[in-house]
């Protein structure tokens, strides 16, 4: 698993949401809400867990990843409900979404260092 790439992909969610807001597109909120559907989620719940599941850095990354997807799912639901101003505000600076985005990125970077991957 390339954790640098995983960090990038999770950072890109803000741009995906902004594009969906502008284009007024529907999103798969149910899948976005789940922390085991994206590539890093599958890895965290599979190989990552079996190899590094006892490391505190792994447990933190797993927790932060779950929180990220829960918050991302809320944004997707706002978009699907056509609450575009609310969705845009939800991904702005200083929001819970921004905070969990930073936290999951930091947690994945710390896991990478601790696991030597």
Which residues are covered by each model-predicted region?
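N-terminal membrane-sensor/transducer module of prokaryotic signaling receptors
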Residues: 1-117
């Amino acid at each position: 698993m390339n954790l640098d790439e995983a960090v990038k992909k999770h950072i890109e969610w803000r741009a995906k949401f902004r594009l969906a807001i502008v284009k007024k597109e529907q999103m798969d909120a149910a899948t976005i809400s789940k922390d085991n559907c994206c590539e890093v989620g599958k890895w965290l719940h599979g190989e990552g867990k079996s190899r590094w599941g006892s490391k505190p850095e792994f447990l933190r990354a797993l927790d932060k990843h779950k929180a990220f997807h829960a918050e991302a799912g809320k944004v997707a639901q706002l978009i699907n409900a056509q609450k575009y101003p609310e969705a845009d505000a939800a991904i702005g600076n200083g929001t819970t979404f921004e905070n969990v985005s930073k936290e999951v990125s930091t947690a994945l970077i710390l896991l990478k260092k601790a696991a030597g991957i």
